[in-house]
């Protein structure tokens, strides 16, 4: 890659392929490389414009005649958990999240492998090896972190470090929020609703850091797999005219945002 292409991002368009979320539809993506000293700034800019990061690639849907994928970000400081979400927080009161550098471990891969085998055995990531997982974590030129969620030790004198690994989130730190790149959890702990818990924890972390948003990726109208992303309100959804606010369930407001 030349110095020019590092400083001036080049965008590419993928060929059509079957959509993994809406049966019978085709998807295309526009993408660019996140490399060089300005990768972090570019990642911030593109995330604000609806892109997502995967390793050193930033991409967003560019499908013909379909705009079902909508970028969403939770307004962290205004968010109030629902009754069901409060129950999930209580159910996981014994879980501690540990912020770590993006270093893959065999313990993480064991949980990752179990998660894929149980929840996404027919998905595009189903065949990922331990080396593929390491690349997913390490291949980044932006500020990214791992958060490991463990059962909290309860012994007297405990340092707070947890016991067995329950879940992991790979998270980018942006100038205006946290972007959840990928998360997974131990499928044997389904009753904990760890996917929801990790989102709630990220909202709390963003609030403590003074960051206004948590980026969740794409809410997809008509996709049961992605419907859950619309439950964290208030949030903003990216429209052609810019970010629009979707209010709490009791007000139903949609307001244009700057």
From Swiss-Prot:
- Keywords, alphabetical: Acyltransferase, Cytoplasm, Transferase
**The keyword Transferase appears for this protein:** yes
The record's catalysed reaction(s) read: N-terminal L-glutamyl-[protein] + L-leucyl-tRNA(Leu) = N-terminal L-leucyl-L-glutamyl-[protein] + tRNA(Leu) + H(+); N-terminal L-aspartyl-[protein] + L-leucyl-tRNA(Leu) = N-terminal L-leucyl-L-aspartyl-[protein] + tRNA(Leu) + H(+)
The record's listing under InterPro entries reads: Acyl_CoA_acyltransferase (IPR016181), Asp_Glu_LeuTrfase (IPR017138), N-end_Aminoacyl_Trfase (IPR030700), N-end_Aminoacyl_Trfase_C (IPR007472), N-end_Aminoacyl_Trfase_N (IPR007471)
Query: What does the entry give for GO biological process?
Result: ubiquitin-dependent protein catabolic process via the N-end rule pathway
Concerning PANTHER family, the annotation shows:
ARGININE-TRNA-PROTEIN TRANSFERASE 1, ARGINYL-TRNA--PROTEIN TRANSFERASE 1
- Give the UniProt family note: Belongs to the R-transferase family. Bpt subfamily.
Q: What protein name applies here?
A: Aspartate/glutamate leucyltransferase
Organism phylogeny = Bacteria, Pseudomonadati, Pseudomonadota, Alphaproteobacteria, Hyphomicrobiales
């Amino acid at each position: 890659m030349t110095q020019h292409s590092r400083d001036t991002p080049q965008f590419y368009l993928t060929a059509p392929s079957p959509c993994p979320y809406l049966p019978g539809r085709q998807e295309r993506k526009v993408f660019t490389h996140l490399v060089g000293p300005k990768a972090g700034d570019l990642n911030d800019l593109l995330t604000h414009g609806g892109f997502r990061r995967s390793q050193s690639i930033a991409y967003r849907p560019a499908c013909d005649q379909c705009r079902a994928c909508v970028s969403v970000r939770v307004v962290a400081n205004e968010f109030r958990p629902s009754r069901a979400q409060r129950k999930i927080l209580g159910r996981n009161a014994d879980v501690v999240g540990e912020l770590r550098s993006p270093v893959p471990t065999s313990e993480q891969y064991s949980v990752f492998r179990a998660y894929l085998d149980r929840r996404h055995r027919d998905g595009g990531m189903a065949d990922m090896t331990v080396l593929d997982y390491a690349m997913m974590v390490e291949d980044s030129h932006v500020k990214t972190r791992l958060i490991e969620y463990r059962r909290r030790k309860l012994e007297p004198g405990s340092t707070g470090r947890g016991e067995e690994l329950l879940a992991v989130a790979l998270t980018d730190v942006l100038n205006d929020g946290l972007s959840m790149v990928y998360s997974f959890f131990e499928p044997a702990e389904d009753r904990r609703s760890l996917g929801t818990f990790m989102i709630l924890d990220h909202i709390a972390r963003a609030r403590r850091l003074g960051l206004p948003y948590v980026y969740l990726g794409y809410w997809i109208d008509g996709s049961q797999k992605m419907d859950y992303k619309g439950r964290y309100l208030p949030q903003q959804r990216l429209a052609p005219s810019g970010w629009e606010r979707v209010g709490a369930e009791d007000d139903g407001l949609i307001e244009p945002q700057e």
